[in-house]
Amino acid sequence: MADYYLKTDNIMKNMFTVALKDELAAQSQMGEVRPATEAMLQKVRDYELSEKRLSITTEEQRELRNALNRLRDKYLAMGRYSDGIDSVILKVMKPNTSRHFFW
């Protein structure tokens, strides 16, 4: 059962995919790959944009947040702007708890 629902578009889906791939690469360098990260990456890849809402649990929210923070740190280290990542992190941190939105 999903705890939260994220209204997701193509840009967010691509950002989630890149962030989770980087997170998996960092985990493999440290020698411990968490199955939850792999499962979340597969869930994001299988997500259809026609559904409009990605259902996530608390653990999946934590995985996304950690992956996006790592991507943000990577961008800041390269001297790039992280405004888009910051806005997505806020959306992940404060997701909707209802499947039905009022807009």
List PLM regions with ranges:
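Positively charged, low-complexity terminal tracts
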Residues: 1-103
